[in-house]
């Protein structure tokens, strides 16, 4: 299931850097993280759903690239984001 408009707007409001911000790296990573977590729970129940697994791997790769970009450009924003999302141990 795709992310609902209400849930996406809630995530955007939480991670936006300014009013109307929908494309910053923080927002993109937060939305991707929600989608990845949702797909992970689906994959646990439907182990043979290979198409969904492939989509999950694409989203993980996209998020990894965005995080690498953010770490290269602004380390402080990167650290705040991974801490707020709980991505690293």
Curated annotation (Swiss-Prot):
SMART domains: Ribosomal_S15. Pfam families: Ribosomal_S15. InterPro entries: Ribosomal_uS15, Ribosomal_uS15_bac-type, uS15_NS1_RNA-bd_sf. One of its GO terms (molecular function) is rRNA binding. One of its GO terms (cellular component) is cytosolic small ribosomal subunit. One of its GO terms (biological process) is translation. One of the primary rRNA binding proteins, it binds directly to 16S rRNA where it helps nucleate assembly of the platform of the 30S subunit by binding and bridging several RNA helices of the 16S rRNA. Part of the 30S ribosomal subunit. Forms a bridge to the 50S subunit in the 70S ribosome, contacting the 23S rRNA. This is Small ribosomal subunit protein uS15. It comes from Streptococcus pyogenes serotype M1.
